[in-house]
Amino acid sequence: MLKPFYARRGLPGLVPALAPSAEQWQSLFTLYIIAAVIVGGAVFVMFFYFLAKYRRKPGTAEPKDAPRVGVMEERGNPALAAILTALLVSLFFGLTLNTFALNAFLQNPPNDPNALYVDVIGFQWGWRFVYPNARELIGELRVPVLNSTCTPAVRGCWSGTVVLNITSADVFHSFGIALLKIKRDAIPGRINQAWFVAEKVDIYPEAIRCYELCGTGHALMIADLLVLSADNFHDWYLTGP
């Protein structure tokens, strides 16, 4: 998989991230902000420079290349225009390449044999979460925190990677966790995948929401995210279904 430039360089995000997905998203957002500040700053500097340099002064004649009615004279510097165009194209190409790399990172779950797979079913108006042991929760998603001691050689443990198989039981919905920077459409008859790794044990009330207008109860289509320690999640999981 292509690793984004900002990930290779460890570009920090503007705010602390709660998961690798959020960290990658924040890093790309920071990259866009830096590019926007540089380009915008350069434009404003040139704007005020030319405004001061070429302002009309009393007693000075109009320049020969000033615009006039009729045939335009040759103006400007084609070489400079070509250089600026090449720089802008390179900038936009780099941003686009990193955006596609981030999409690939978010849309393709890692090959983790110890990942937890959860079926997510949207309905009017709520979320149902079905675990591999057939246990179901409505309005609450429980996941294990990142467990660095869980390796592929260790069976019966969860690494912390959570893969969500998202669908809908009725109309179109859109499953999203803003804190983790993940969002996928929930479409009847189709399964879309999302994944994340939570790095901090905590309770995030109403962190899960529907991001597509789906009826009169759309605003109430929320769910809590509970990130449990490895032991607590294991104990809870074994009590199901």
Where are these predicted regions, by residue range?
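Non-transmembrane, membrane-proximal soluble domains of secreted or membrane proteins
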Residues: 2-29, 51-241
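Alpha-helical transmembrane segments
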Residues: 25, 29-42
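Residue-level signal for the membrane-embedded core of alpha-helical transmembrane segments
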Residues: 38-46, 87-94
